[in-house]
Structures are given as structure tokens and as C-alpha cells.
Amino acid sequence: MLNALQRPQHREWLLEQAEALLEFARKARQPLGFAYLDKNGEPDFGQPIQAWISCRMTHIYSIGALMGMEGCREMAEHGIRSLLDSFQDPQHGGFFEAINHQPDAAGHAVPTPEGERKTAYAHAFVLLAASSGLIAGIERADELFNAISGVIDRHFWEEGAGKMRESFSRDFGECEAYRGVNANMHSVEACLAAFDAQLSLGVAANDERAARWLARANSILGFVLDLAGRHDYRIPEHFDAHWQVLWDYNENDKTHQFRPYGATVGHALEWARLACHALAMNQKYGVDAGEHYARDAYGLFRQSLGNWHGDGAAGFVYTTDFQGVPIVRERMHWVLCESIGAAVALDGVNAADAPVGDLGLAEAYVATGLGGEFSYWYEQFIAYADRYLIEAPGRWHHQLDTENLPAEGIWAGKPDIYHAFQALMLPLLPFGPFITRAVKISSAVD
């Protein structure tokens, strides 16, 4: 166990901060979904209602429902309804990426011109929302799960490649000639959630209804972790339709929110966490995959630490080149959140008799071993969040400048609570199950 978690006051602080996030985000609820929030936690009506935000909120409030938090079940039910009734395309199937706040004269949701495209990123989050809804027993979550499963099977999952296609035109007639690691990363998370959702319904782990989701997660993970290992644990993120690296992709748009140029530090940390979760599931259910996941997760974690204070200021830079030189030096809250999750997950792997092995520990940690290392970094990351990111309970700055002052540019406002909430909850939960199922079976939040 991480040293900090042996202190009751720290566990209480984590839970109080998580509950404050659930309270802060309540104003996001709008008739057709969940709105993007501004820096004061008010709906930003200059932004459309976006699927990824509505899905993340549905996922988080499903967890809140399992925690017994007042009003969270109603929020999750609203999210499931909005995804089915507002975001689902009644003409071509699939789910819109973004819709207008105002419906048409007949009361139907209207996609924005850009938001009518069908993207793997948005569909991964629909699967996440449906899975958490199933685990939490949210009304109509089964309907949403069946709908999104069918769309992924028919259009997004590319069996020969063992990964997700990126995006399609509204009618699924045109497939984008690009493949991306970001959408596939969130697809891994969603597949792990879907696997656990099936288990929560009593489906056996080796039943195809459950097993296919874990197999898909392992397929994507195997590719990305092998790729990372061959590039000094800095992950190329952009590919053509044949999965050949596009090294110069977005060289002229280095601060892109979802497809930035270079290596994204926070994604390395997120992949490390997901690899640990998949490893635990594989081991528990006898799946012959992922024998190198612990090694690669640790490699990603250690390489990312080279960017901690990497430009002389506290915190993680956003992106680097493939030699580790910072490109975009602004600090994103989600990167720090994923560093917390990675430290927690690696500690869980190490404590579960699946040690990451002799991987060249920093000399300072030899005396205490890996557990000491993860405890040290966990406390460093929590201290940074408390000092720089948490404006007040429930209010996390989403972007800081190079001097760690609140800033905007890449991200404006405080759009959602997904990364911060998970970072606060993961330390409190048993390691192994996906976060929503872990809450369901845990007494840590009672």
C-alpha cells in the first residue's frame, strides 16, 4: 500500500475532494446532455454539447450513484437518456460527436456541422458510459450498451489490424485515412470497462460476450506497448491508414487538444495505468496475454518522470520531441491526474506478487524498493495538485502556464471532472477491477 494511504486523514481528503467534484459539475446538466463548463463552473453556451463530455459525466455520476451520493443516479440516468435520444443518429446509426444546445422545431437534437462525424474517440466514451451505467444499474444502460457494441462491431473495430478505425462521415461511407493512438487508448479503457460490465451481469469471463472486450484491449495494448518499447518509451501517436507512423503530423498545430505534435507525456502515463489494469484482469481470469505489461508500464512511467520539472519549473510539460526535448511546456491538469493513477496502478501490480522486476531502480529507492518509489512519486504528485491545480475543493484548473499560473489557450474553463475524479478515487479502491466495478465491490467509500 502507498504510504500516504495508511493515514486516515489522507483517505478522508481524497474522498472529500472527489465528492466536491461531483457537486461542482452539477450545473453541466442541460436538456440534451451535459455542457462544457467555464472557469466558474457555469455552462459555456458558446461550446456545443459534446459527446465526450456527456459520456464522461455519465460515467462519473454512475460511480457517484454507487457511492450513494445524493442526486448522482438522476444525473447518470439523464446522461444515458441523452446519449440514446439526443446523440444517437436515427438515420445512419452511431453517435454524433457534438450537437447544438437547441433542438429543431420537432424537438430533435441537431448535430453541428463538424459534430455529425462519427469518431472512435466519442464512441469509446459512449461504451465507457454504457459500461459504467450497466455496473451501476442505471436505467436504459443495457439499451445503450447494445447499441454502441453493434456500432463498434460493424464500423470501428478493424479485425485485421486489431485496432480501432479513427472516424467516418455521418453515413459511414467515408473512413478517414488516419489512425490515432489517442482514440485507441480510450478504446482500451472502454473495453476494460465493458469486460467488467459483463462480469457484473453474471457473464463468465471466458464467455464471448465478455472475453471479446478484454481481447480487444489486449490487442491494442500489445501494439502500443511494443511500439513504445522500440522508441525509448515515447509513443508515436499518429499513423496513416496502414498504421505507418506519421512523424510530422500536426507539426504546424503543436497544441492540438486531441492530436498534438510529438510525444504526449500524459498519454504515456495513461497507457502505463491501463496496462496495469489489463495485466491484473489477465492474471485473475487466466488470459494468456500481457507478460510484458508490467515492464512496459514501468518503462513508460520512468521515461515520463524525465519530464517532471523537465524545463526547470514544477510539473509535467505537455509534449516533447522523441529525444525528450519539451515542445509545448504548458501544464495540463489531466497529465498530473494520470501520473497519480499510474503510480497507484504500478504500486498495485508490485504489491500483487507481479513485480515489475529489476529494471534499474534509481539509486535513491534501492533501500525501499519499488513500493517506496511509487509512494514517493504519489506524494509528489498529490502535493503538486494541492498547491497548483486545486483552486478550491471541486475546482481544478485545467491548464497552467510555464510558471504554473492559471492559463487558457489549449483548454479553456473547467470542462469536466473525469480525470480529476478518477485520480482521487483510484487510490481508495482495490486494485484490479475497472474503477466503476471496484467502487461497487469496495467498502472503501462506505
Regions found by a protein language model. Give the residues of each.
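Glycan-recognition and catalytic cores of secretory/periplasmic carbohydrate-active enzymes
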Residues: 1-446
